[in-house]
């Protein structure tokens, strides 16, 4: 059974917490489906080309229908002309969102969490707190303390998951390139897969692993 590594206040290993048995044997295809769903939902639908009705000009017939020796033409906005409208071009009213049901979302999250635990990259701490926030409340101090926490983990990049994240914690991590801090309500399978390691507050971990199959 996979286990999360429990860290003390100095970020040293002091124990472990088991993941529920239902996390075993989940199909990885659920994570694939969720990643496709997530990326499609954040896709910016900005590509747009003008069709022949939207191109300016073309109010008169460019040349006589007969007698010129050229192919007949009714408007210079036709797609056959340079500067004319585009046929079958991109439109900005397309919906790229891919549907995924609640069960698949849950299974994708559980699979991603299980993968992190198997790789020994899932850590649990009592509290993700930045020292001195009451006394100093300065962004420079907050960032320095947050960076100390990140460096102590000795990980390439890290996702920090808080329960009821406060503004000081968010500010502290906001300028650090290789880590991200989020509230547990924002946690999803894509973020779990995107970061090489995950640090969760104990209450956030318990909230995530509780059985939601009946919800």
Curated annotation (Swiss-Prot):
InterPro entries named in the record: Ribosomal_uL4, Ribosomal_uL4-like, Ribosomal_uL4_dom_sf
Keyword rRNA-binding: yes
Cellular component GO terms, alphabetical: ribonucleoprotein complex; ribosome
GO molecular function: rRNA binding; structural constituent of ribosome
Compositionally biased tracts (Gly residues): 56-71
Record keywords: Ribonucleoprotein, Ribosomal protein, RNA-binding, rRNA-binding
Biological process terms in GO annotation: translation
Any Pfam family: Ribosomal_L4
Gene3D superfamilies in the record: 3.40.1370.10
Region listing for Disordered, in residue ranges: 46-76
Subunit (UniProt): Part of the 50S ribosomal subunit.
Role of this protein: One of the primary rRNA binding proteins, this protein initially binds near the 5'-end of the 23S rRNA. It is important during the early stages of 50S assembly. It makes multiple contacts with different domains of the 23S rRNA in the assembled 50S subunit and ribosome.
Similarity field: Belongs to the universal ribosomal protein uL4 family.
The protein, known as: Large ribosomal subunit protein uL4
Organism: Helicobacter acinonychis (strain Sheeba)
């Amino acid at each position: 059974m996979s286990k999360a590594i429990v860290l003390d206040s100095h970020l040293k290993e002091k124990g472990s917490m088991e993941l529920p048995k239902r996390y075993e044997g989940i199909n990885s295809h659920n994570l694939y489906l969720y990643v496709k769903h997530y990326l499609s939902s954040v896709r910016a639908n900005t590509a747009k080309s003008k069709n022949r009705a939207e191109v300016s000009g073309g109010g008169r017939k460019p040349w006589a229908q007969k007698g010129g020796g050229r192919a007949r033409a009714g408007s210079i906005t036709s797609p056959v002309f340079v500067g004319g409208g585009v046929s079958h071009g991109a439109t900005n009213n397309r919906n790229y969102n891919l549907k995924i049901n609640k069960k698949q979302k849950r299974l994708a999250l559980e699979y991603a969490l299980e993968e992190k635990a198997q790789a020994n990259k899932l850590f649990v701490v009592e509290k993700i707190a930045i020292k001195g926030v009451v006394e100093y409340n300065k962004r420079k101090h907050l960032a320095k303390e947050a960076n100390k926490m990140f460096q102590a983990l000795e990980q390439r990049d890290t996702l920090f998951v808080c329960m009821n994240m406060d503004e000081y914690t968010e500010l502290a991590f906001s300028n650090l390139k290789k880590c991200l801090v989020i509230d547990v309500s924002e946690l999803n399978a894509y973020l779990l897969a995107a970061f090489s390691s995950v640090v969760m507050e104990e209450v956030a971990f318990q909230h995530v692993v509780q059985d939601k199959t009946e919800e």
